[in-house]
From Swiss-Prot:
Inhibits all the catalytic activities of DNA gyrase by preventing its interaction with DNA. Acts by binding directly to the C-terminal domain of GyrB, which probably disrupts DNA binding by the gyrase. Belongs to the DNA gyrase inhibitor YacG family. Keywords: Metal-binding, Zinc. Disulfide bonds: none annotated. One of its GO terms (molecular function) is DNA topoisomerase type II (double strand cut, ATP-hydrolyzing) inhibitor activity. This is DNA gyrase inhibitor YacG. Binds 1 zinc ion. The gene is yacG.
Amino acid sequence: MTTEITTVKCPTCKQAVIWDAASIYRPFCSKRCQLIDLGEWADEEKCIPSDDMVSDSEDWSETR
């Protein structure tokens, strides 16, 4: 029985990453690339697109 090795590209540096339990930072190749990605989300360089327009006004509330 032959098992296929699945590889993905690291979202940060594009290096090939083997997708299995031994790759503890998957889909990233390393802790460094994982932290770079986290920093981009924290700095709002990355975001999930939305049709909702949220303003910073005083009327804004977390409940709808």
